[in-house]
A protein has these predicted regions:
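Charge-rich, low-complexity N-terminal segments
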Residues: 1-139
């Protein structure tokens, strides 16, 4: 029977929503204040859940040191105190929109790739604040 473990990581980052091919007026109509040219920031909370069998010797489903190293490299180092649109190439103009949904999916892909066969990531939740959380769960 699988067990689950969730590790939380936080980061502060700025972003805005904008589609380069659209006029400023259309971006403002669709994205509202989130399309403002000077960006805006959040104190993000990201919960990454992994699953696996409990090791009969260690009692763990994953080595927390390894998981923490991956989260530091793939999440905190990439996003903390960054402008997501400008500093994370995948989210630049014409790339991914820096929504909570896209951040959750992107973080899932990066963390799962880094962990490889060690464990399976089953859920990534990204909260911009206490009232809004986006969740990605792979099929």
């Amino acid at each position: 029977m699988p067990s689950f473990l969730t590790r939380r990581v936080t980061f502060a980052a700025a972003h805005r929503y904008r589609i380069a091919e659209w006029s400023d007026e259309r971006n403002a109509a669709v994205f509202g204040a989130c399309a403002r040219p000077n960006f805006h920031g959040h104190s993000y909370v990201c919960d990454v859940t992994v699953t696996g069998a409990i090791d009969p010797v260690t009692g763990f489903i994953v080595d927390l040191g390894v998981l923490d190293d991956v989260l530091q490299r793939e999440v905190r180092s990439r996003f903390d105190h960054a402008n997501i649109n400008l500093d994370v190439s995948e989210f630049g103009d014409g790339g991914l929109m820096p929504t909570g949904e896209e951040l959750a999916r992107f973080i899932y892909q990066q963390v799962q790739h880094a962990l490889g066969e060690l464990t399976r990531v089953t859920r990534v939740a990204v909260s911009e604040d206490a009232t809004l959380t986006a969740v990605f769960e792979p099929d």
